[in-house]
């Protein structure tokens, strides 16, 4: 109880008990730099679900549309500190929404100058604008015909204040801005950044068009990694450097040891053959001495076997990446499924982050190395 009271004092230093039994608290809750008066009356058992919340008229007005949520939080919060933290977060949201609702509209010159800038840029570049013209999306096409979007969130003091902008790039996009800047200046910087990344997107598009990419299924333009099928239950994961896209990428293989090890040996032996003048795909073919499975002949289902434990292919966005090393078995599993399975076996043993056990299918020895690798 003392720990809870200390935590409550830290979270809400202006809310204090008004009696010895601590059934009545009164004071202030702070949010967005403002303090709001409130009083909480608890029953003798201190259960929040039977408590009463008395608010000042300012606080009651701000929370007027959130009455049901406040009631739900009181019903389900285990103690007063938990409820106060939830109430504080709710108050922050309510105040933010209120500020946006009652924010003063931009002056007329905001719209006139913005319309003029879009006209200079070309209305064909505008793909979206909300009713207030506070959010707009502009498109651009690179030399290879790919379309790219930039989303701009304009503030009331535009152009004195820089807009927020969002792009789907594999590297940070930092546009310079002065009070004299305009949509034309930020769009020019957007175009320059697109051209600087053309070689990277050429490399990734060739991989997407000519190989079976297992992950990601629908890669955004910002994605630098690809997991490419090499055959049944064997794949290579590559991480391409957007600034040096034709250099040797980070590579690691996924699959049974008896299939993966020969590929690793070839990569080490032939690494000197890597030629930055060639594409990543061509270099991988030369270095690994393989032909990637052709999209024209094979279907993706030829490489996408379900997990042998959960019987699904996709699990929380991941696909099976662990394979039984027994060449007669080769059953794939999700890492987390295999981990939970092995952890439940009395015969399994663990050494650091490696678990040793038996394959659920063939009962041959199987090893699982747990990692924090993102899929």
UniProtKB/Swiss-Prot annotation:
Binding site for Zn(2+) 2: 324, 329, 359, 362
Zinc finger region(s), RING-type: 307-363
Region of interest: UBC-RWD region (URD): 104-294
Pfam families on file: FANCL_C, FANCL_d1, FANCL_d2, FANCL_d3
PTM (free text): The RING-type zinc finger domain is monoubiquitinated in the presence of UBE2T and UBE2W.
Outcome of swapping residue 248 to A: Impairs interaction with FANCI and FANCD2
Localisation: Cytoplasm; Nucleus
Lineage: superkingdom: Eukaryota
This protein's record includes keyword DNA repair: yes
Illness: Fanconi anemia complementation group L: A disorder affecting all bone marrow elements and resulting in anemia, leukopenia and thrombopenia. It is associated with cardiac, renal and limb malformations, dermal pigmentary changes, and a predisposition to the development of malignancies. At the cellular level it is associated with hypersensitivity to DNA-damaging agents, chromosomal instability (increased chromosome breakage) and defective DNA repair.
Protein's name according to its UniProt entry: E3 ubiquitin-protein ligase FANCL
Source species: Homo sapiens
């Amino acid at each position: 109880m003392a720990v809870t009271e200390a935590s409550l004092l830290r979270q809400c230093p202006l809310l204090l008990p008004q009696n010895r039994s601590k059934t009545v608290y009164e004071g202030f809750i702070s949010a967005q730099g403002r303090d709001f008066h409130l009083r909480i009356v608890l029953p003798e058992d201190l259960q929040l679900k039977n408590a009463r919340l008395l608010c000042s008229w300012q606080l009651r007005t701000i929370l007027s549309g959130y009455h049901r949520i406040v009631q739900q939080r009181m019903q389900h919060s285990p103690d007063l500190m938990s409820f106060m933290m939830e109430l504080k977060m709710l108050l922050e949201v309510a105040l933010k929404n209120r500020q946006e609702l009652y924010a003063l509209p931009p002056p007329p010159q905001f719209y006139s100058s913005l319309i003029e800038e879009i006209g200079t840029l070309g209305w064909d570049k505008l793909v979206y604008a909300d009713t207030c013209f506070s959010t707009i999306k502009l498109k651009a096409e690179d030399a290879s015909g790919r379309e790219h979007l930039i989303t701009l969130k304009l503030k009331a003091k535009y152009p004195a204040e820089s807009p927020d902008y969002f792009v789907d790039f594999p590297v940070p996009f930092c546009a310079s801005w002065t009070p004299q800047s305009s949509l034309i200046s930020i769009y020019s910087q957007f175009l320059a950044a697109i051209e600087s990344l053309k070689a990277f997107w050429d490399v990734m598009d060739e991989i997407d068009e000519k190989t079976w990419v297992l992950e990601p299924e629908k890669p955004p333009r910002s994605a630098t990694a690809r997991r490419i099928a090499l055959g049944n239950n064997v794949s290579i994961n590559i991480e391409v450097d957007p600034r040096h896209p034709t250099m040797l990428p980070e590579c690691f293989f996924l699959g049974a040891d008896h299939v993966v090890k020969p590929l690793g040996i070839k990569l080490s032996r032939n690494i000197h053959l890597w030629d930055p003048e060639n594409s990543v795909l061509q270099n991988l073919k030369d270095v690994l001495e393989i032909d990637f499975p052709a999209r024209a002949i094979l279907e993706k289902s030829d490489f996408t076997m379900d997990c042998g434990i959960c019987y699904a292919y996709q699990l929380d966005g991941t696909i099976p990446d662990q394979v039984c090393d027994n060449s007669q078995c080769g059953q794939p599993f999700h890492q987390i499924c295999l981990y939970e399975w092995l952890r439940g076996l009395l015969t399994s043993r663990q050494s650091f982050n490696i678990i040793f056990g038996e394959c659920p299918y063939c009962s041959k020895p199987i090893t699982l190395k747990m990692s924090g690798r993102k899929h």
